[in-house]
Amino acid sequence: NVYRDGKKLTDTPITVSTLFRDKNNSQKTAVYEVRPVLKGKETHHIDGTYTLPENAPLGYLEIPLQKPADGITPAGDTYTYSPNDASIGDVDGDGEYEIILKWDPSNSHDNAHEGYTGEVYIDCYRMNGEQLWRINLGKNIRAGAHYTQFMVYDLDGDGKAEVVMRTADGTVDGKGKVIGNADADYREAGTFDPSRNQMMKQGRILKGKEYLTVFSGDTGEALHTID
């Protein structure tokens, strides 16, 4: 059940969705409360209330993000970062979702394309914008939709979500620890094609170790890595 300022808004408990739209158009401060219904009995949750401030934007919450710095590839090309894929999970067991967000460089590439890419970052934020950690996938994970998928799920059933993704030598976890060989660089330097007067086959990664790593959702620490 959903309440606003103590007034019940739902005729029956919400059971088939994860959202509720309040048709109230007032711009005044409002306190919303979600009360779980278990076995037909309404209960309370310690973190079940949220205060919507006066004149709040409609339809969304603004969450400040920590954008990574721009970069330059070995070929001398510059790139910038923008928010990309995101998922949610309760990483610390407090009953509130956190956001796990991927930062993608502007020079990300598909499998069929050559060229260097910037490094990919995975961040975790609270809803108030507090950054909990950042994972750097490193130079040996190419940026692109086919390379950098991740999963957020409570794998061990402890009430805290873990984060799983493909990693490689040089990936840096949320505690600053490097996975594998920190000095490895498997990116192709490329060859010069006189007929095109340009470098070809640059930046592709066709060799080197690949890993699957489970990270702590709470700290970003690498918990277990397999190859």
Where are these regions (language model features)?
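Beta-propeller-forming repeat regions
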Residues: K7, D11-D227
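Conserved aromatic beta-strand anchor motif in extracellular beta-sandwich/beta-rich domains
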Residues: V2-R4
